[in-house]
Design a protein with these regions (language model features):
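FIC/Doc superfamily catalytic core
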Residues: 1-339
């Protein structure tokens, strides 16, 4: 089995792009407490929106879907799962809620990762929740002609418990040492987790739950207000491309994690920028039409009513609809299709 020692990251000479991304995120973290003092009730709306988006997007990445109406009902716990997809969506909802509410009390240990996986599959009848894989799994790639090939072979099942123990121990040791920036350490842990692929199913979703957990524990709570999973889903091609680049030669301990680190830092920074923009809109004393107009002016390309509602959580649905109609009549925006 390959070894895991994150102390080596301390000696890596990171390029200017990574250093610049880290510096910008540090700056936003410094302003984070100021953001959180603004209109708690409105910020709570951002939390509700982000929970729904995160639950929907993280599952959608894996092809687990239901209707927008059902997603909202499931996230609001106003209905029960009707099928396997909805069972797994409901499990993600619960696991994410557990992280939101109790991240300080979820240490990075194998036993807690297993418990989180158990929550993810608590509604499933498959009996795989909370257990490491018992059969060899593969990361496959489908070629243009439809042929499926094995792109990456994770660790064997018998190696998995020891490997997860090893990455947790090394991560905790380096976290305690404070010698490696968490923004570097966290993506390094996640790429190893994905390469180990410790479960029969749910590895991708668990990696995103763990990303949120690790960021929260390091003091980066932007994912509570702006969905990181949604940003990943919208850039899914880049997500998988950087994963593929960063897991190449992983089994030989010769992989380069730089592409995945850059991708994750870019995603976190984009979330902080969105958060600042939304807080700025919330702080203003503008009318509903002015808030919507401002949101529209700051949106590039096509957008939906839901996109605008996300940007102006202090404005009700009816007011957003009326404002968009007014802007359409004024010729500020054009409408495509219905809805």
């Amino acid at each position: 089995m390959r070894s895991f020692d994150y102390k080596k990251l301390k000696d890596v000479k990171w390029d200017s792009e990574i250093l610049g991304l880290v510096a910008q995120i540090h700056e936003y973290k410094g302003k984070q407490s100021l953001f959180l003092k603004q209109k708690p009730a409105t910020l709570e709306k951002l939390v509700d929106i982000a929970k729904i988006q995160s639950t929907e997007a993280s599952n959608k990445i894996e092809g687990i879907v239901t209707t927008a109406t059902r997603i909202k009902q499931l996230c609001d716990q106003k209905t029960t799962p009707r099928n396997r997809d909805e069972e797994e969506i409901s499990g993600y909802r619960d696991a994410l809620a557990l992280i939101h509410e109790s991240y300080e009390y979820i240490p990075i240990k194998s036993s807690y990762i297993l418990q989180l996986h158990q929550v993810l599959y608590r509604y499933s009848q498959r009996g795989i929740g909370g257990r490491f894989k018992n059969t060899q799994n593969y990361i496959a790639e489908i070629k243009e002609n439809g042929e499926q090939i094995v792109r990456f072979m994770p660790l064997d099942p018998f190696e998995t418990p020891m490997a997860i123990d090893a990455i947790c121990e090394s991560f905790n040791r380096e976290t305690d040492s404070c010698e490696i920036d968490p923004l570097i350490l966290i993506p390094a842990f996640i790429i190893d987790f994905l390469c180990i692929h410790p479960f029969n199913d749910g590895n991708g979703r668990m990696s995103r739950l763990l990303t949120t957990l690790l960021l929260y524990r390091a003091g980066y709570v932007v994912g509570k207000y702006v969905s990181l999973e949604s940003k990943i889903e919208k850039t899914k091609a880049s997500y998988y491309e950087t994963l593929e680049k960063s897991d190449m030669n992983w089994n030989n301990e010769e992989n380069d994690i730089t592409p995945f680190i850059k991708y994750m830092l870019g995603t976190i920074l984009a979330a902080y920028r969105d958060f600042e923009e939304r807080v700025t809109l919330v702080e203003g004393k503008s009318s509903a039409i002015d808030l919507v107009r401002n949101a529209v002016n700051n949106t590039i390309g096509k957008f939906t009513k839901s996109d605008i509602m996300e940007l102006v959580p202090s404005v009700g649905k009816t007011s957003v609809e009326n404002s968009l109609k007014t802007l359409t009549r004024e010729g500020v925006i054009g409408r495509e299709g219905k809805g």
